[in-house]
């Protein structure tokens, strides 16, 4: 298996060298052709996907996991639309981000270049095969994909379509490769391939991400989990705060930018929490609170220490009453995952302090945590949300799949 993975790495390195020179018009054409081929291969994709669905049901996987595997007509349409949207994004490769002139007349700047070869290890959702490959191609990279065993047939079918599309548009098919085995040893071999892979990106549950982070020999862009907070200040507009909290928790509770802990200033807790709790209960949210919360909210379960660290991904919410913003920030610093935090307040100074002192990938004032998303922030498609501070912090779009090199323009300058 080691030799097979090494061969893939070498082919990816050659493909990456070619992709770095490809212009935007050519990349756009390839991505649009991928979309057409996805649309034209619906029957073949559905047939492969049915094999995965039947196997998942036979294994007794939970209905939610089976649903994540499903590639119906709507998902395939979204997949094709996603490819077209990525094709239309601005190409960052070759962009000169800054330029300055030295006293000797030497002009120095920074130019965006592809990362090179990207490895992506992911679970369940077969649409990641297409989404990840599209972003890597747009940024001029090659990618090696290793999907979850549950989606093996779907991933293989989709990867074959992408590779054929590359060939049909004159690009190297090895710019997209899929590890063709469900053997877990292949994952370890991939993580040891630092001579061929420039960066590894895991997408999935916390266990997978920790495994990759602990075993990879190359840099890893990751996010462990989203323990997201909303702090309702005593100078908040209560109606606005209720709308924001409902959206942050209830709209899509199973995603990483959903609120998991609500922090409420003691000065507003008595009048804010009862109607807020009633609205949450009407939406089916289970509430777990601190002692002060339980004195205000009837029938609220006792929160324990583990609740403050929890990423529920469900209709469960931890609530804590705090004395002031300083205590709220201390709580976020101790228990948060540096993903997304929001403050609801009408006080400019407190909002500014919250923005400065809370060190998460997105910090919001008077808006829902659900906005930590590439499209919602105007960045376009994303490969995930990084909670690593090195290289990328927050949504990882096309630009985050590039790096910069220095360039210098002279007219004969010599160093004295």
Curated annotation (Swiss-Prot):
Example GO molecular function: glutamate-5-semialdehyde dehydrogenase activity
Principal localisation: cytoplasm
One Pfam family it belongs to: Aldedh
Keyword Nucleotide-binding: no
Keywords assigned by UniProt, alphabetized: Amino-acid biosynthesis, Cytoplasm, NADP, Oxidoreductase, Proline biosynthesis
Superkingdom of origin organism: Bacteria
EC number: 1.2.1.41
Any one Gene Ontology BP term: L-proline biosynthetic process
Recorded metabolic or biological pathway in which this protein acts: Amino-acid biosynthesis; L-proline biosynthesis; L-glutamate 5-semialdehyde from L-glutamate: step 2/2
Entry's Gene Ontology cellular component terms: cytoplasm
Function: Catalyzes the NADPH-dependent reduction of L-glutamate 5-phosphate into L-glutamate 5-semialdehyde and phosphate. The product spontaneously undergoes cyclization to form 1-pyrroline-5-carboxylate.
NCBIfam families in the record: PRK00197.1, proA
Membership in a protein family: Belongs to the gamma-glutamyl phosphate reductase family.
Name of this protein: Gamma-glutamyl phosphate reductase
UniProt organism field: Syntrophobacter fumaroxidans (strain DSM 10017 / MPOB)
């Amino acid at each position: 298996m080691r030799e097979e993975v090494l061969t893939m790495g070498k082919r990816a390195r050659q493909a990456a060298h070619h992709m770095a020179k490809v212009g935007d018009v050519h990349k756009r054409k390839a991505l649009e052709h991928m979309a057409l081929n996805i649309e034209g291969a619906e029957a073949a994709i559905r047939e492969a996907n049915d094999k995965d669905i039947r196997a998942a049901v036979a294994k007794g996987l939970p209905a939610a996991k089976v649903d994540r595997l499903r590639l119906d007509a709507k998902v395939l349409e979204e997949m094709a639309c996603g490819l077209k949207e990525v094709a239309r994004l601005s190409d960052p490769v070759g962009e000169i981000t800054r330029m300055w002139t030295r006293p000797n007349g030497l002009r120095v700047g920074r130019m965006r270049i592809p990362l090179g070869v990207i490895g992506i290890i992911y679970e369940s959702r077969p649409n990641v095969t297409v989404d990840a490959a599209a972003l890597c191609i747009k940024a001029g990279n090659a990618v090696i994909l290793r999907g979850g065993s549950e989606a093996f047939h779907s991933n293989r079918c989709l990867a074959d379509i992408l590779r054929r599309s590359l060939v049909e548009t004159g690009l190297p098919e090895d710019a997209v490769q899929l590890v063709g085995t469900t053997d877990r040893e292949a994952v370890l071999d991939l993580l040891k391939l630092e001579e061929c892979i420039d960066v590894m990106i895991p997408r999935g549950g916390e266990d997978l991400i920790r495994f990759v982070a602990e075993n990879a020999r190359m840099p890893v862009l990751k996010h462990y989990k989203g323990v997201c907070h909303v702090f309702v200040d005593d100078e908040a507009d209560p109606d606005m705060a209720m709308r924001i909290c409902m959206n942050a928790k209830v709209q899509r509770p199973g995603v990483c930018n959903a609120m998991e802990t609500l922090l409420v200033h003691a000065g507003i807790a008595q009048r804010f929490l009862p109607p807020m709790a009633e609205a949450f209960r009407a939406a089916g949210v289970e509430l777990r609170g601190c002692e002060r919360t339980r004195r205000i909210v009837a029938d609220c379960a006792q929160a324990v220490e583990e609740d403050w660290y929890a990423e529920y991904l469900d209709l469960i919410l931890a609530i804590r009453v705090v004395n002031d913003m300083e205590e709220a920030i201390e709580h976020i610093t101790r228990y948060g995952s540096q993903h997304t935090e929001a403050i609801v307040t009408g006080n400019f100074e407190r909002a500014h302090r919250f923005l400065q002192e809370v060190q998460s990938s997105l910090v919001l004032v008077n808006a829902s945590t659900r906005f930590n998303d590439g499209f919602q922030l105007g960045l376009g498609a994303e490969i995930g949300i990084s909670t690593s501070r090195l290289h990328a912090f927050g949504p990882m779009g096309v630009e985050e799949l590039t790096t910069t090199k220095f360039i210098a323009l002279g007219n004969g300058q010599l160093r004295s």
